[in-house]
Amino acid sequence: VAEMRAILKQGTSVQVEHVPVPEPAAGEVLIRVAVAGVCRSDVNAALGLVPCADPLVLGHEFSGVIAGLAPDVRGFAVEDRVTVMPLIPCMNCERCAEGDTESCPYHECLGFQRPGAFAEFVTVPARVVHRMPGTLTFREGAYAEPVCSSLGVLKADIKPPDRGLVHGADRTARLAERVLRSYGFTSLDVRGTGTGEDRAGRIPPDTYDFVVASEPRAEVLDEMIRVVRPGGRVIVRGRPLEPVPLDLATALRKEVTLESVSYGTFAASLAFLCQERGHVSDLLGSVRPLEDFEDVFSAESESQRLKSFFCPDFAGIGTDEIEAWARLMGPGA
């Protein structure tokens, strides 16, 4: 049986292990992983802070090249450059029936319920695979999932010229700001714990038509309720690890709408990346071998300023060299 290297979580242990190369089942494709992004939720899974399968190959944000297909798969070919929506929809619920599969509440996720992408190969249903535009690098393709998540804010009932606040000091807040600006929201502030603006003083109450809370902690949500205008919206992104208490009395008094959002569409994510490439490049960090996972996970826990990536096939070489190799892997490069 052919084997591959993968970051495998078993119980409380996380190690790079040799595991069997998966074979695509009916309706699936086998993808050779070129680049896989590291998210805080991957670290939480590694630490056992979120429910997930055991044993489990971690990782859910990635791009790569199709290496094999089940006989019934149509529309793809070996060597196609692809990226993947890691949420596997149930295809049985009302959302799925409406075609809004990115919002399926009963999904499974790569790297949590199904084997993930911190590996040389991964199998996924063909219905969540998206061919990458030839202009995108594999690192940008692996960033499609975070962009898709940020696009979820547009599901909220907001529109230009509404005045908004994005709360947060990390890359997810900066990405959400850029997504909103690209859709015409020009009256927009960004402010987060630890920033100079935050230390300079409190925002006056009732300042914004809407606020986006990327860190759903109690103190953050209470502050967002305070600074949004009566009748305004608090848009909640991110997934807290524990239940969050809320100042519901103030929210009721001000008739504030609390709106939780998840994902936009993956097609819109790829379109955004093609159009706004220069506006995300400063959010993308280094590419590392799988064997560096302890350092990468530690850095992600301490700071979420830049997105780090794994390249399963390489160790100890620079990002540019990895990109040069990766772009040769597909005919659309």
What does each of the following model-derived ranges do?
Residues 136-202:
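Mid-domain Rossmann-like dinucleotide-binding core that forms the NAD(H)/NADP(H) cofactor-binding site
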Residues 20-36, 49-94, 133-135:
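Glycine-rich beta-strand-centered segment in the early N-terminal region that forms part
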Residues 27, 201-211:
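A short acidic, Gly/Pro-enriched loop at the edge of an enzyme's catalytic core
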Residues 232-233:
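Glycine-centered, small-residue-biased loops immediately flanking beta-strands
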Residues 2, 267-333:
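C-terminal hydrophobic helical "lid"/dimerization subdomain
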Residues 238-256, 268:
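Rossmann-fold NAD(P)-binding glycine/threonine-rich loop
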Residues 39, 51, 85-130:
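Cysteine-cluster motifs in flexible loop/terminal segments that predominantly coordinate metals
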